[in-house]
Amino acid sequence: HFGVPAAQIREAIESYAPDNSRSQWMAKGSNQVILDAYNANPSSMSASLRNAAPRLNADETLYVAGDLFELGDYAEQAHQEMVDLMQELGIVHAVLVGPLFAATKHPYTSVLRTDDLAEAWSQDPPSCRSIWVKGSRGMALERAVNALAPTA
């Protein structure tokens, strides 16, 4: 513990508020956003989905999954596995962002670019939702989140 009192450690952990697109919680209008768009790979996305799905109301949660990069020959299979996992977990509302997710077999909404989602949300934003957002850094999914109205 390096001589740091337990109470001080607890206070530091409890007061930590991420602001770097890594597991960042924020209010955007009437929505609560969980933004984890700094980096993603199949294992981190799977773990995040498995953690979020049982805790968030399926009817009130919108999942936004952005393409996972640098997977080489495994890319197609990995993206299909993520979509299959989403369905297995009972995820009802999702937007898949990027050409790799668009190529999968899925029942969800799909857009090719983050800017397409940002434009759609600027015209017709979701409301009163929990919005889970995760994808590779290069997808810049925070641009879509930024299109949502700020909290008044």
Predicted regions located by residue number:
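ATP-dependent carboxylate-amine ligase
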Residues: 1-152
